[in-house]
């Protein structure tokens, strides 16, 4: 599955200690603004997540994708009020060839849901890997517990219910 991921999702999966498994089992792309938000700026501030994400890029497990957004897509971004990093995610997805967007930004998810764009939240990605038999039930619960404090209670409990 070919995924365009935003900063929020990438950071949450990193903190859940499952990002490595995600990037090894899915074809994950991030746009330049997400790279800036998750690597360039945080590295300068000494955040360890940034170094882990950069390592995945260096190993080819994560790809920076460039979009060729047309004027129509740019107008959609402006009229829908899509934010900084998410605008790059949206442009990359609309450039074609991607299956889903991974995000946990509520406002962005409402917009892409209304547009019929498929998406998975970080917890849903973990459950997806469980359903694909990449993760055991025990591993899945451990990863969900790792992410519990940084996702909504609803997200967490829905994901747990899917696994049990």
Residue ranges and their predicted role:
Residues 1-96, 106-109, 113-117, 155-164:
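Active-site-proximal, substrate-binding regions of enzyme catalytic domains
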Residues 101-102:
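Conserved SAM-binding loop
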Residues 109-164:
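Acidic, PIN/NYN-like endoribonuclease modules and their adjacent C-terminal/linker elements
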């Amino acid at each position: 599955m070919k995924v365009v991921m935003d900063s929020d999702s990438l950071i949450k999966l990193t903190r859940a200690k499952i990002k490595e498994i995600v990037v090894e089992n899915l074809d994950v792309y991030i746009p330049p603004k997400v790279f800036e938000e998750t690597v360039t700026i945080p590295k300068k501030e000494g955040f360890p997540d940034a170094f882990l994400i950069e390592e995945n890029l260096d190993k080819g497990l994560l790809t920076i994708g460039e979009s060729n957004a047309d004027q129509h897509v740019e107008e959609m971004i402006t009229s829908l009020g899509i934010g900084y990093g998410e605008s790059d995610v949206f442009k990359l997805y609309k450039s074609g060839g991607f299956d889903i967007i991974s995000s946990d930004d509520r406002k962005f998810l409402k917009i892409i849901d209304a547009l019929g764009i498929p998406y998975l939240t970080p917890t849903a990605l973990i459950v997806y890997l469980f359903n694909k038999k990449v993760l055991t039930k025990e591993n899945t619960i451990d990863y969900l517990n790792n992410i519990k404090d940084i996702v909504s209670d609803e997200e967490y409990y829905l994901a747990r219910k899917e696994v049990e």
